[in-house]
Amino acid sequence: MKFDTKVVRAGITPDPTTGSILPPIYETATYVLEEVGKDKGFDYTRSSNPTRQVLEANLAAIENAEYAISFASGMSAVDAAFKLLSSGDHVICGDDVYGGVTRHLDNVLNRYGLSTTYVNSVDADAVSTAIKPTTRMIWIETPTNPLLRITDLEAMVKIAKEHEILLAVDSTFATPVFLRPLEFGVDIVMHSTTKYLSGHNQIIGGVLATNRKDIFDEMK
């Protein structure tokens, strides 16, 4: 399936109940169980919802990802990614990233024991130099917000794999049209779907995509 077709068709199948070509919006909090402990794939909308599942399947497809999880905002997705870490862990973050990310790291997550070093991610040597024994994640944007710097993803993947560090990329500005970081070996891709993926300025949302089942299971 070509990319343009994926954008409009991936994850979308006729509704099994009515045959509707487009999926309905399921406005429900809970679901009837067939019996105790046995559901039809959904039990509570906070964990999953048929409408959201369609969105996630589509976003996974256009990122060439095995898994995608949608969130109520881009910052919710950012927070979920950092929650893969533990108190005492260290993050290397690009020094030109969305301000909400730096504020969250400096004003919220640092209170829970997460430390951060900011570096110019364009400089691979600077990233390598910043690595500590406790470093567990490298977080970068490419292009960056707002200066539109471009980071060498192949170099970042090499560094991350050598040190067994998670590599997360905010690819909001590029969109999957121009860049699919998972194809380079990145562990996690994040998008604020509020921006280009929505395109019409009427929704707020976020998504994390990955090819690693262990990461998906932990975030889900």
For each of these PLM feature ranges, what is it?
Residues 1-42:
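N-terminal glycine-rich, Lys/His-bearing helix-loop that initiates the first secondary-structure elements
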Residues 3-7, 57-61, 185-187, 191:
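Short, hydrophobic/aliphatic alpha-helical segments
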Residues 9, 69-220:
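Conserved PLP-enzyme active-site core in the AAT-like
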Residues 9-12, 49, 55, 152:
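Sequence-pattern detector for short linear motifs
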Residues 16-18, 44, 48, 120:
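Alpha-helix initiation/capping motif
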Residues 20-21, 53, 64, 202:
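Short, basic and Ser/Thr-rich N-terminal targeting/leader segments
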Residues 30-79, 83-84, 100-107:
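Conserved N-terminal alpha-helix of the aminotransferase class I/II PLP-enzyme fold
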